[in-house]
Amino acid sequence: MRFLLLLTVALLLTCIMETDAEAKPEDLAERFRERSDCSGMSDGTSCGDTGVCQNGLCMGAGS
């Protein structure tokens, strides 16, 4: 009985870890889009959460 319980918990943890690992690349891609979305804006313009446009890139966004 304990073996089945441990096996079930292990499988659930594995599924949760895989789901979390799959979500991270999307988060990074979204963060990159935020950082690079300064096309047409002049340098010094605010962008993202706390970023500033420099040479067409949003520097410091999300930090």
From Swiss-Prot:
Signal peptide start-end: 1-21
GO function terms (MF aspect): toxin activity
Record keywords, A-Z: Disulfide bond, Neurotoxin, Secreted, Signal, Toxin
Compartment(s) where it occurs, according to its Swiss-Prot or TrEMBL record: Secreted
Entry comment on modification after translation: Contains 2 disulfide bond.
Propiece residues: 22-34
Cellular component aspect of the GO annotation: extracellular region
Location, primary (coarse class): secreted
Tissue: Expressed by the venom duct.
Entry text on domains: The cysteine framework is XIV (C-C-C-C).
Protein name (Swiss-Prot/TrEMBL): Conotoxin Cl14.11
Source organism: Californiconus californicus
